[in-house]
Amino acid sequence: SDVYKRQLFACLTGLRKSDIRQLTWQQIQPYTNGRMFVTTRMQKTKEIVHNPISDEAYGLLGERGEGLIFEDFKDKMLQGPLQRWLTAAGITKKITFHCTRHSFGSLHVEMGTDMAVIQAYLGHKNITTTQIYSKIAAQQMCQVVDKITLKRKEA
């Protein structure tokens, strides 16, 4: 369904609901290397971002058309199916459409993407905003805790 595709597109791009709601086909264009890019003025910050999107994300958009990519994008149409999917999966935590943006940032941190790259992709002016979105996994913290030591290396 379109709702399902919107949700997955948001997960793969980190775009806000307000930006996806107004996304048009004219904003998605190939770059010189053939990679598809989305260029949009973020509704919240008014910053212009020019970001590549994965082939998988582009594939979710379906056949290229004119005007808005996702028509009839209303909050009620999103939240109802999302809650049904969560219930069916046995998930009781409150999840909203915006959680896709958090997931995008958090997954990139877990995969080792540089924080400055995540910041630029999400269009954050301040790195501390990115750090809030991207909660560093405890496992990663455990991996680095022993890297600094007072012990001398044996010769």
Per-segment meaning from a language model:
Residues 3-4:
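Short, small-residue-biased leader/transition segments that mark boundaries at the very start
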Residues 39-48, 67-74, 93-99:
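Short, contiguous acidic/charged loop-to-helix segments that flank catalytic cores in large enzymes
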Residues 42-46, 75, 122, 126-147:
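Catalytic-site neighborhood detector that most strongly recognizes the C-terminal catalytic loop/helix
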Residues 52-92:
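Active-site/catalytic core of tyrosine-dependent DNA strand-transfer enzymes
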Residues 8, 12, 18-19, 101-125, ...:
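C-terminal catalytic core of tyrosine-transesterase DNA break-rejoin enzymes
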Residues 148-155:
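C-terminal secondary-structure termini that scaffold catalytic or DNA-interacting sites
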Residues 13, 22-60:
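Conserved tyrosine-mediated DNA breakage-rejoining catalytic core shared by Y-recombinases
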